[in-house]
């Protein structure tokens, strides 16, 4: 199931960013079929028992000054000709906050230090153009010359690192309900027994314009809200962190997710030219070729690639035929083999397919996706993410999660065409945001009046350029 989730995150996260910043060719909307597919088995989700726990009181060494954003009335031209509202943020440099904690991982207790702060990113003249928020976790008593150090971030572009931070990498994580649904407030934290902190020190970094990372002004935002500027800002952050924390001799790693994998590739090349090389790079939900993500009339590449993921998710929701449902992993491999051969060849033929070939493809797609033949015919044998998530459980008036296909949310209109939304974001956003804001203030003792932007879109000013 992990491979399915990873693949689905790869596809949909970057499909979203592509639509936002570099939209593909216009798609002609079609009216979906009015009839409903045969009823299927109700959704089931495996239990994942988690117990909440109370927050701990850290040992505090420093407290940062309060940092309040300010805005000015000017405006400036943004990326790709779009208008950016004028903005200005206080770039006063404040010492980071240091607290001490412990956690039990893999049967042994780890004592570690958490450092939260904002790293200045300067221009060629030494002026601070931005500050990047980070939280570093370092195990006490280790030798920096041999202790691995991993820099980790989410993608977007325009996503904060909160999702990896509080869901996978950090020593503390958000408590969700066993079925993965959003729990009722107050939301809780618990120790993360799967944190890689026993293997490597971790630095979680927020991209400029996300989290508490801010550009100095509108001109600085234009400098960083593009691929080149984004890579340069992370490269400079890493150089500064190694310098200020005397970690130049440590084994270095990058851990990026979705667009963060593209960023990782860029950072590796950028820093190699400046004398910094990495021992390894971890790519989660990899996107290094954007053609694999662009669902468009003139691009058939994504459709065979996504099919095994659809099979995994359909199996999770018990939507596969009985002969496939018993072994979903085997079914996904069968779908992969068919997609790379017969399906790909059929798409290449297009209208040259014989009626029998068309019927065979229709049968197989229905078999591997759990969708009705009518829906697949309407989609012209090309099922994209929006079609799949909207129609898989439409007979139950449920919508499947986009970022995580295990999630579902109510869709009262059922088979009627409705605005697209993602139950995953709806159910994880509030717990993650609330818990993180409480965690950094109470356990890490980091104080600020600024809002934490989980997405740069929350700035109301985000314009991304792919140059």
Where are these regions (language model features)?
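Catalytic nucleophile loop
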Residues: 260-265
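Compositionally biased, proline/threonine/alanine/serine-rich low-complexity intrinsically disordered stretches
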Residues: 17-91
């Amino acid at each position: 199931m992990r491979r399915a989730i990873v693949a689905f995150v790869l596809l949909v996260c970057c499909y979203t960013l592509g639509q936002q910043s570099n939209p593909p060719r216009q798609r002609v909307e079609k009216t979906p079929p009015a009839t409903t597919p045969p009823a299927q088995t109700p959704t089931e989700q495996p239990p994942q028992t988690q117990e909440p726990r109370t927050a701990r009181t850290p040992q505090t060494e420093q407290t940062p000054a309060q940092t309040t954003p300010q805005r000015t009335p000017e405006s400036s031209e943004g990326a790709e000709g779009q208008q950016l509202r004028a903005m200005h943020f206080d770039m006063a440099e404040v010492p980071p906050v240091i607290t001490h904690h412990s956690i039990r991982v893999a049967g042994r207790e780890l004592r570690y230090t958490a450092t939260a702060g904002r790293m200045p990113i300067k221009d060629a003249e030494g002026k601070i153009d931005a500050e990047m928020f980070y939280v570093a976790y370092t195990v006490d008593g280790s030798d920096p010359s041999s202790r691995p150090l991993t820099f980790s971030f989410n993608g977007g572009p325009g996503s904060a690192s909160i999702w990896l931070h509080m869901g996978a990498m950090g020593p503390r994580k958000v408590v969700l309900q066993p079925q993965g649904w959003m729990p009722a407030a107050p939301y809780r934290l618990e120790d993360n027994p799967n944190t890689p902190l026993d293997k490597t020190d971790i630095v979680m970094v927020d991209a400029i314009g996300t989290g508490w990372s801010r550009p100095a002004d509108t001109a600085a935002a234009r400098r960083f809200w593009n691929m080149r500027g984004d890579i340069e800002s992370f490269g400079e952050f890493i150089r500064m962190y190694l310098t200020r924390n005397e970690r130049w001799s440590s084994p270095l790693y990058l851990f990026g997710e979705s667009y963060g994998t593209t960023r990782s590739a860029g950072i590796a090349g950028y820093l190699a030219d400046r004398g910094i090389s990495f021992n390894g790079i971890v790519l989660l939900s990899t996107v290094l070729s954007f053609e694999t993500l662009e669902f468009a009339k003139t691009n058939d590449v994504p459709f065979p690639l996504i099919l095994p993921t659809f099979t995994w998710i359909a199996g999770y929701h018990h939507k596969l035929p009985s002969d496939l449902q018993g072994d979903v992993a085997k079914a996904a491999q069968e779908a992969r083999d068919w997609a790379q051969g017969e399906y790909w060849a059929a798409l290449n033929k297009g209208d040259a397919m014989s009626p029998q070939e068309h019927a065979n493809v229709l049968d197989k797609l229905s078999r591997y996706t759990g969708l009705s033949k009518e829906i697949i015919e309407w989609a012209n044998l090309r099922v994209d993410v929006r079609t799949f998530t909207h129609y898989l459980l439409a007979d139950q008036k449920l919508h499947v999660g986009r970022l995580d296909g295990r999630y579902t949310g109510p869709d009262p209109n059922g088979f009627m065409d409705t605005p697209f939304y993602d139950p995953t974001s709806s159910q994880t956003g509030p717990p993650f945001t609330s818990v993180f804001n409480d965690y950094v203030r109470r356990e890490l003792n980091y104080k600020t009046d600024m809002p934490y932007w989980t997405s740069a879109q929350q700035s109301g000013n985000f314009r991304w350029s792919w140059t």
